Swiss-Prot record:
This is INO80 complex subunit D. InterPro entries: Potential_DNA-bd. It comes from Xenopus laevis (African clawed frog). The gene is ino80d. It is found in: Nucleus. Keywords: DNA damage, DNA recombination, DNA repair, Nucleus, Transcription, Transcription regulation.
Length: 812
């Protein structure tokens, strides 16, 4: 279904209204569409077309919709404008009232012509007649409604329709007669004012003898001069009291008498007053009011009809002591309030039954189905008409009853109250029928037999067994045995009244089951609490996604570290070896772990572990929470990638060590040059050895270690192991006695160790170069990442480099 932009709902019943897009429309929607009849053209699928009329003054087309099924081009309003259909004549709303006013004015004018205004005045100056004011008289069609019989409950609606024309004629005649009687009453009252009072008139009706004046002043007034003594001035009766008048027909007198006599409580007529008349008092005489009793009699008739209808609605048979449930009581009230003919037979079911009787081809034919459907709709229409007619009749009955009750309560409140009390008692008796008295139930004992004899317990109501032996009755369905079993496997035989559980339990076993379930829940909670860690290092990031790290593949095998001892005939002298203890190489930040604390069988366990076993991040998930709390000072994680960051002092020492390494690299480059020139001749080597032995070479190394670069001596004199404890230096890298004493020169040691002059040519240079390369490799492999911003080869002093070049030139 297509909808516009303005989708809103009604504030009264919250139903959707027209969704017209250009502006807000508060009209109701058409069935099946989202627009009203005025704006339904916005929906292109609607079966409507636009009016083709175009206005002349603005050249705009009419927007009224026309059904597509109708063969016309213009809407109804423009068909009238164009003259295709006649225009409707609008009737004025005040036409009926104007007719009534003109008719009333004519009546008052005729009355004023027949009766002079002075004749309606009493001698004391009071008006004799209570004339109705202008406009108080109702028209004839209002009088017709009053003259209708409101108690025609048994009349059928069809008969009412047939007799409407006859009834209207009769009512119009009655209204005319009533108006004539009214005029004759006025004329008779005018004649009665000035007529002499007869002593005993045999023609006077008994109703006139009972008639007395309501207000009779006995004041001594001057009587008119032209009248005799026996003339009595009677005050006329009020117009609002419907009493028989003198000039009325004898039929009206008899009706008044019968109504007066049929009253339930006739009003006694007081005897004439015998007291002397007084001038300062006005004597009031109580008279019978038969009009009041007519309202009560009307109400009595309605009450009788209501009770009769209630008796017809009651059941023919008693309830046999069974009370109505709440639902049935509500259904009974609903049925009382609902209109008759509410339950109707199903026409569709009857058609299906007829279809079964017919042949298959005839039943499935289109014409037969259309005929059946038409018949169904006709019957349904008749049924709805009956329902509507019954509903209207019921509303009319209720309105009549309320009107009669109001009038009777206004006139006779006591009698009306008594009637309502009687009606209420009959209603209560109908809604709550008298139940028959239940027979006296005798106390019966259980009929079960036990070992000692018969059971003495009291039997349950409507049974022959007590609670303990109720299971012996095979016909009962309310009780069942307990489904629990004891420790020895015996079934519990206690009866249980439990209709909610599939496995009923007695009271004892139910308590045990509750305690067991409660303890099981507490154990689960306690176990769950024990599994939680005692201390959380960091709160888990709930919003942060955890990325799983990929498993690293097998690492590539690293190149083997070259051995500390040089290959070939060049061996490391024992005098140059520097003793380094392994225990002193550990980082000062790590705790001192002794092997005594380890278990005895740890060596066997270590040998069983395969060497190709890889460790992943998941392997540490169970190990890290078990670490003791006293490892807070343990530098396990430092830096971003877990590397050990050097302190300021270590950085300074490392800088000095790297400067020494650069000097050793210079010496190694010199040794390479000398090795290249070694093939030129033996003279050069002999001269180098002699020069080196005489002290020139020793002076060079001595001056190098003492004067030019004092840090090199400190580096080689054992400060490396002390300042860089984290370096794992090889023990055969440097000797312990070499360069330990600054006064000792390298020449004596070299001459003592190397006796062959052929192998001594490059021994010192090779030693220094190999030791420098080894030391540099160890330092660079451990601290190249941490000391990268500190490295600066330009810090090597130019004097040291120039001195080294000078001495090497002399040595060559």
């Amino acid at each position: 279904m297509y909808e516009g932009k303005h989708i809103h709902f009604s504030e009264v019943d919250n139903k959707p209204l027209c969704s017209y897009s250009p502006k807000l429309c508060k009209q109701r929607r058409l069935n099946g569409y989202a627009f009203c009849i005025r704006h339904v053209l916005e929906d292109k699928t609607a079966p409507f077309k636009q009016c083709e009329y175009v206005a002349k003054y603005n050249s705009q087309r009419c927007t009224n919709p026309i059904p597509k099924s109708e063969d016309r081009r213009y809407c109804n309003s423009h068909l009238q404008v164009l003259g295709f259909i006649p225009k409707k004549e609008r009737k004025k709303k005040n036409d009926a009232l104007e007719d009534v006013k003109t008719k009333h004015q004519m009546e008052t004018m005729a009355f004023s012509l027949t009766v002079p205004p002075l004749a309606l005045k009493m001698p004391n100056g009071h008006d004799g007649l209570n004339l109705s004011p202008p406009g108080a008289r109702l028209p004839i069609h209002y009088l017709e409604t009053d003259l209708e019989d409101p108690f025609s409950f048994e009349e059928e609606e069809e008969e009412l329709k047939k007799g409407t024309s006859v009834k209207k004629k009769l009512q119009s005649k009655l209204a005319q007669n009533w108006q004539r009687l009214r005029e004759t009453e006025i004329v008779n009252v005018h004649q009665e004012h000035f007529s002499p009072h007869p002593a005993h008139s045999p023609l006077q009706s008994p109703s006139l003898q009972e008639q007395h004046t309501l207000v009779q002043p006995i004041s001594t007034l001057p009587k008119p001069t032209g009248l005799p003594q026996n003339l009595v001035c009677k005050s006329p009766q009020p117009s609002n009291i419907s009493q028989p008048v003198q000039g009325a027909s004898p039929v009206t007198h008899t009706v008044a008498q019968t109504r007066h006599q049929s009253s339930k409580r006739p009003f006694p007529v007081l005897p004439p007053v015998t007291e002397l008349p007084r001038n300062d008092r006005i004597q009031l005489a109580a008279t019978a009011l038969p009009a009041y009793s007519s309202y009560v009699s009307r109400l009595q008739r309605l009450v009788k009809l209501c009770t009769r209808k209630q008796q017809l609605d009651t059941d023919l048979f008693p309830h046999f002591g069974l009370d109505w449930s709440e639902d049935s009581g509500e259904e009974q009230e609903d049925s009382d309030q609902s209109s008759p003919y509410r339950t109707a037979w199903s026409f569709r079911e009857s058609f299906r039954y007829d279809c079964k009787k017919l042949d298959i081809e005839e039943a499935h034919s289109r014409s037969s189905r259309i005929a059946q459907l038409c018949t169904y709709f006709q019957q349904k229409y008749k049924h709805l008409c009956r329902l509507e007619r019954a509903e209207s009749c019921q509303k009319k009955y209720r309105h009549t009853f309320r009107r009669a009750l109001q009038q009777a309560a206004h006139r006779e409140s006591e009698t009306t109250g008594q009637l309502l009390q009687e009606l209420r008692t009959t209603t209560c008796i109908r809604t709550r029928p008298i139940q028959p008295e239940l027979r006296g139930t005798e106390v019966t004992l259980c009929s079960a037999t036990i070992s000692n004899g018969a059971c003495r317990n009291r039997a349950l109501p409507y049974t022959r067994n007590c609670f303990q032996h109720i299971l012996s009755n095979s016909s009962q369905q309310l009780f069942s045995s307990c489904t629990a079993k004891f420790a020895d496997g015996q079934q519990c035989s206690v009866p249980v009244f439990d209709i909610t559980h599939q496995t009923p339990l007695c009271e004892e076993h139910a308590k045990k089951m509750d305690n067991f379930l409660r303890g099981d829940n507490s154990r689960k909670v306690q176990h769950h609490q024990q599994r939680k860690p005692r201390k959380k290092t960091k709160p888990p990031a709930l919003t942060k996604k955890t990325k799983k790290k990929r498993r690293r593949g097998p690492r590539r095998p690293q190149k083997p570290i070259p051995p500390a001892v040089p290959q070939g005939n060049l061996c490391m002298p024992s005098s140059l070896s520097l003793p380094v203890e392994v225990s002193s190489i550990r980082s000062p930040s790590t705790p001192n772990l002794s092997t005594e604390e380890l278990p005895d069988d740890i060596t066997s366990e270590i040998t069983d572990i395969p060497h190709d076993l890889e460790l992943n991040q998941e392997d540490f998930s169970d190990v890290l929470p078990r670490l003791p709390d006293d490892l807070q000072d343990f530098d396990f994680f430092e830096g971003k990638n877990g590397d050990l960051l050097p302190t300021t002092e270590e950085a300074e020492e490392l800088e000095r060590a790297l400067q020494a390494v650069t000097s050793l690299e210079c010496l190694s480059s010199i040794a390479v040059l000398t090795q290249a020139d070694n093939a030129t001749g033996q003279d050069l080597s002999d001269r180098g050895i002699s020069a080196f032995s005489t002290g020139s070479g020793g002076s060079v190394i001595q001056s190098l270690s003492r004067e030019d670069h004092p840090d090199l001596g400190d580096l080689l004199n054992g400060h490396i192991g002390h300042n860089f404890a984290s370096l794992e230096l090889d023990e055969n890298l440097l000797g312990s006695t070499t360069l330990s004493n600054p006064s000792a020169t390298l020449s004596g040691h070299i001459q003592g160790q190397f006796s062959s002059p052929a192998n001594v040519g490059l021994s010192s240079a090779t030693l220094i170069s190999r030791s420098g390369e080894r030391l540099g490799r160890e330092v660079m492999s451990h601290h190249v990442d941490a000391a990268a911003p500190i490295l600066d080869k330009q810090r090597v002093s130019g004097a040291l480099y120039s001195g080294m070049v000078k001495h090497s030139a002399e040595w060559v």
